[in-house]
Amino acid sequence: MADLATIARPYAEALFQSAKPAELAGCLEQLNELAQLAALPEVAALSNNPKVSADDLSKLLSGMVKTKLDPKVASFLNLVNQNHRLVAVPEIAHQFEAMKNKSEGAAEVNITSAFPLEGSALNDLLSSLKKRFGGKELRPTIQVDPTLIGGVRIQVGDEVMDSSVKVQLAQMQASLGA
């Protein structure tokens, strides 16, 4: 089977191009909801069951989401189910979000810290990152990982900046030849 990102890209592009700028946020919200459902083992089992038609699966999933699906998203869901690509929906949602952010001049930022970041420390970090990335609007996701010991690990797109104590210790160990 081809790489999931390769399979997902045309679906994400098609949905992105069919949505108007004002519809992007709503489509993304519904797509993320469908991605969560598609990741459930029970839903995966249904999608692989030859007795369950693509239309039935689409109706079932449409009924499981919180709000009525936008017609574009409903059509997208039918297409995905007809092509037996429900497994790719989480990756499609990820790529759709990246396209939305790019069109809005924004970037997702994953920040992992050894300790909770709050208040002025978080604001200072985001301010520095905003300057570093050309004034883009940053949409942070913050996680705490005590194994970092100290410092932060920041990922924006493909770029990773790791100033954690864990990485510094590993670099010292490598340089000492231990």
Curated annotation (Swiss-Prot):
F(1)F(0) ATP synthase produces ATP from ADP in the presence of a proton or sodium gradient. F-type ATPases consist of two structural domains, F(1) containing the extramembraneous catalytic core and F(0) containing the membrane proton channel, linked together by a central stalk and a peripheral stalk. During catalysis, ATP synthesis in the catalytic domain of F(1) is coupled via a rotary mechanism of the central stalk subunits to proton translocation. Pfam families: OSCP. It is found in: Cell inner membrane. Keywords: ATP synthesis, Cell inner membrane, Cell membrane, CF(1), Hydrogen ion transport, Ion transport, Membrane, Transport. This is ATP synthase subunit delta. The keyword Cell inner membrane applies. It is a peripheral membrane protein. It comes from Polynucleobacter necessarius subsp. necessarius (strain STIR1). It comes from the Bacteria. InterPro entries: ATP_synth_OSCP/delta_N_sf (IPR026015), ATPase_OSCP/dsu (IPR000711). One of its GO terms (cellular component) is proton-transporting ATP synthase complex. The lineage of its organism: Bacteria, Pseudomonadati, Pseudomonadota, Betaproteobacteria, Burkholderiales. One of its GO terms (molecular function) is proton-transporting ATP synthase activity, rotational mechanism. The gene is atpH. F-type ATPases have 2 components, F(1) - the catalytic core - and F(0) - the membrane proton channel. F(1) has five subunits: alpha(3), beta(3), gamma(1), delta(1), epsilon(1). F(0) has three main subunits: a(1), b(2) and c(10-14). The alpha and beta chains form an alternating ring which encloses part of the gamma chain. F(1) is attached to F(0) by a central stalk formed by the gamma and epsilon chains, while a peripheral stalk is formed by the delta and b chains. Belongs to the ATPase delta chain family.
